[in-house]
Amino acid sequence: MDPRGPVPQPFQQLQKPGRIRRRKTRRERNKALVSSHRPLARQDPPISSRDPCVILQDPVASAAPKLVVITQGRLSREHRGLFNHEVKSLDVARLLNRGALESHTPQLPTKPSCSPVGVQEPDLQSKGKENKVPGGSGPGPPNSPDLPVLGQLLEELQYQLIVPQAFPRRNLVQESRDTIIRTLQGCHGCVPDLALVLRGCQLPLPEAKPRVPERQRMASSCMEVPEHAPREGKQRTQQATKGCDFAIPHTCNSTTPAHRGSQVQPPGHQLPFLSSASSPSGAAWGPPTAFDMLKSIWLIATPPPPPPQPWDVRPPQPLPQPPSPLLPRTSALDWSPNPPAPLPSLSWVVTQSSPEAWSFPPMRLY
């Protein structure tokens, strides 16, 4: 028997067959993961490892407030996103380039031997900006920034932008209007009336033509044509006068011989091709366009209504014109003053072609 007693066997307890190690839950693993990363971001280096130049810094200069721009969706208080990856504030200096950042960053007063540390310090601060709370680590609002430095940064930011003219208080609409008016006065000598321009741009529909101005135009066509009128206006008036000769002869017969002599067309002058369907703004906007030509071909102008006549006087009917061999005999290319004959309706065609009426049986859903 050994006098030292039984020898302890410490490794027998670890070799138990029924021992199962408990696995950590997800909450415990996440907590351990966050706790392992948070001290690395927040803890300060030990005092023994600090540079003596940093210890000798001015405490007032080291506590200078940072310039922070708070925009929509960004906070300045201590609020970190999921797993510390969400940035909630943005420094003004980060919007500028590195040269502007180094020129406008206040240099801390240090010794000459510590100048390399002072140069490297802004780089270290810029690296840890996303992990540090701007304006102090307390939960209160950040300190007020320095106004002169903020003004310099805004000026530098203004020079960086593409459109620096947007910052001064200028009335861009008024300047554009003055430029347009100055150009019009330099090219044409006057500013056109906006009401006349807008009236000429509005093209009336062929179905909704006003009847009273048409009658007034026919009545005014029998009057004298001023000499200073445009050439196309004279042609339109002469054509309307020619139409007035066969429509109301007793009205135009009372004109003077001098006026009748002014209505005579020169032998080498022809009527414009688009006089019947040309836009009312043709005289003001130059020669007719291709759109006016298509409109004159495919849109049939409605004839003006006959003027009121006494019961015993009837205007002479125009003679039927022989069809031209160059144009096909279609209603779209009919140049006669009479409107084309209306086409029969679809219901009439159906009733003539089908012996029974259109009737549908009741619809069954199933």
Swiss-Prot record:
One of its GO terms (biological process) is meiotic cell cycle. It holds the Pfam family Pro-rich_19. Residues 18-29 have a biased composition (Basic residues). Residues 1-53, 102-149, 256-286, 301-338 are annotated as: Disordered. InterPro entries: Pro-rich_19. Preferentially expressed in gonads. It is found in: Nucleus; Chromosome. Residues 275-286 have a biased composition (Low complexity). It comes from the Eukaryota. The keyword Nucleus applies. Keywords: Chromosome, Meiosis, Nucleus. One of its GO terms (cellular component) is nucleus. Residues 302-326 have a biased composition (Pro residues). Disruption phenotype: Mice are unfertile in both sexes. Testis weight is significantly lower. Mice males show a depletion of late prophase spermatocytes. are depleted of post-meiotic cells and their weight is significantly lower. Residues 104-113, 256-265 have a biased composition (Polar residues). Transmembrane segments: none annotated. Promotes meiotic crossing over formation through its interaction with CNTD1 by participating in the crossover differentiation step of crossover-specific recombination intermediates. PANTHER family: PROLINE-RICH PROTEIN 19. Interacts with CNTD1. This is Proline-rich protein 19.
